[in-house]
Each structure stands twice: as structure tokens, then as C-alpha cells.
């Protein structure tokens, strides 16, 4: 008999954002987009900033922004350990736009005190937040 659902836990250092049975999970891994469904092969990978699209057992969807982290897939359990995780509805578009602008300014600064890698990571997180906001506004 085929598995119809898998248990998912999404946690950050601050809180547990989701725990329950799901039909599928779409998430951004270090090598690209991943689709996790019941019966998926075991997997351990790092996550890039982006969206976790959860399709619950009843077919409804929930979207969570992840700043990065780790994904572990086992036969009956999927665990997302996020650096920072925020429900899409709680994201602030204006704050994300401002963070994007600050990161771009830092990347364009020519001073010796500019850490390009930090600025690039900040830009990636801000852009990922904006993509999550845009994707969820299309769903609603």
C-alpha cells in the first residue's frame, strides 16, 4: 500500500512553525528546487533562502519563508531545521525592500570595511523574502 502522507516538522531556534501530516513539500535545497512526497528516498541537504510550500493532508497550503537551514528526509518523517523561519503572512514587504536596498548599497560600496559575502547573503535573504511575498499574493 502506498503512503499517502508523511509527517513534517518545521522548526527554527525560536519556535516550531509546523508539525503535522502533509501530502507534499516544495523547498529550495542547495542544489535547486526539491519536491518531497511520501516515500521519498532518505536525504540530508542544506537549504538556501526561499519558500517552503506545504500541501497539508486536507489539500490546503501553507507557505513559510526560510533564511536557510537543513532538510532531513527519512521514510516517515521530514524535518526542516531553519536558521530563521517566518510564516509568509508575517513577512513585511517594506522591510524586505529596505533590506534589499541596504544590501545592494553595501555590495556597491568600495570601502575596505565592506564584507562582500555578508552583503551578498543579506541580498539573497531579502530577495527570497520578496519572492515569497509575491508568490503568496498570487495564491490569494
Curated annotation (Swiss-Prot):
It is found in: Cell inner membrane. SUPFAM superfamilies: Epsilon subunit of F1F0-ATP synthase C-terminal domain, Epsilon subunit of F1F0-ATP synthase N-terminal domain. It is a peripheral membrane protein. It comes from the Bacteria. CDD domains: F1-ATPase_delta. Belongs to the ATPase epsilon chain family. Produces ATP from ADP in the presence of a proton gradient across the membrane. This is ATP synthase epsilon chain. It comes from Colwellia maris. The lineage of its organism: Bacteria, Pseudomonadati, Pseudomonadota, Gammaproteobacteria, Alteromonadales.
Amino acid at each position: 500500500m502506498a503512503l499517502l502522507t508523511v509527517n513534517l516538522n518545521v522548526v527554527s531556534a525560536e519556535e516550531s512553525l509546523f508539525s503535522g501530516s502533509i501530502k507534499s513539500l516544495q523547498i529550495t535545497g542547495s542544489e535547486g528546487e526539491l519536491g518531497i512526497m511520501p516515500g521519498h528516498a532518505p536525504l540530508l541537504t542544506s537549504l538556501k533562502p526561499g519558500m517552503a510550500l506545504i500541501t497539508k493532508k486536507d489539500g490546503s497550503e501553507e507557505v513559510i519563508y526560510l533564511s536557510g537551514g537543513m532538510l532531513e528526509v527519512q521514510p516517515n518523517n521530514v524535518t526542516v531545521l531553519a536558521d530563521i523561519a517566518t510564516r509568509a503572512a508575517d513577512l513585511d514587504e517594506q522591510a524586505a525592500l529596505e533590506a534589499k536596498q541596504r544590501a545592494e548599497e553595501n555590495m556597491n560600496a568600495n570601502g575596505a570595511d565592506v564584507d562582500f559575502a555578508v552583503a551578498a547573503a543579506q541580498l539573497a535573504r531579502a530577495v527570497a523574502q520578496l519572492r515569497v511575498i509575491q508568490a503568496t499574493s498570487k495564491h490569494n
